[in-house]
């Protein structure tokens, strides 16, 4: 091993170790969750909050954003899109924002987007929080990612941490600049491990709508074994670092060459062709739509004041589902629990930048391995313009409501 590579591996493993949450982190996050529940109890009837995202998967740092799903008495994920239910949820989120501000949360704002969210900074920990109503998919995929990480926490953890650190430094992960979010790039990184035989392919989803379930993933992971050589990597950061570095090289090489115009990123079917993804989505939405209609009809039968069923509302609700699963966007990265295209928000104008960064990473990690410098690979860039929408300018947008302590 050349000197530059050895120093690079030391640097990346030190970076990973320094990013790990302290032993008491689970207590800190639990207390944060309790504070959010206290707010929820004031805002909705019989509130329940559930954490999801990186603090559940384990692919986090102490200061990672906290994603939280809020539900309430008689909540049903099937009714989103029904005008009266959406209006009530809007009132619930507005009350939640007011109560969050009153209880000491900072920079509180309610964004009434396709997926409404209340954002704030926790006054105790400084952790940024995103609270949405009934994010069932987010909760499920976080549990699956957690199960994946548990196979070998340091191996998967170091690899994903370094991919994300690179992505954030190089504006490949920057949703506020219309590039990827962390979950999307994590999925991309995991598909490379599947191609290397270092993670099973979740090819037999058994969900009611053709989706992968937590039980599906856990069953397959229980049977999965990494190659025997990986047993020697425990408690040896030099050997572990070499294995992680190899995977980083393959990640860079893979996506520098990958034909995104034809293929999708999928943990259910790696390199699935877009036309196949279209068929899968079509069938998924057929099943989803049938169940959704049944739930709407049931709700209206029990709540005459909300009826009759508005076909325009129902069509708009299903169109919203379709909009989240386009097959013609520059990138198609499948969310494995509901087939949402997580890469859909990347604008065509960002494709060149992203491809340049994959090429740069491949060149530095492979072509110029003997000249490796950790600081240069992870050097922060600031070349991609920020998205000037509600996430960029806040109070200028009518969809954003800010709250200040009374």
Curated annotation (Swiss-Prot):
One of its GO terms (biological process) is RNA 3'-end processing. CDD domains: NT_PAP_TUTase (cd05402). Keywords: Magnesium, Metal-binding, Mitochondrion, mRNA processing, Nucleotide-binding, Nucleotidyltransferase, Transferase, Transit peptide. The keyword Endoplasmic reticulum does not apply. GO terms for cellular component: mitochondrial matrix; mitochondrion. Its main location: mitochondrion. Changing residue 183 to A: Complete loss of catalytic activity. Binds 1 Mg(2+) per subunit. Belongs to the DNA polymerase type-B-like family. This is Terminal uridylyltransferase 7. It comes from Trypanosoma brucei brucei.
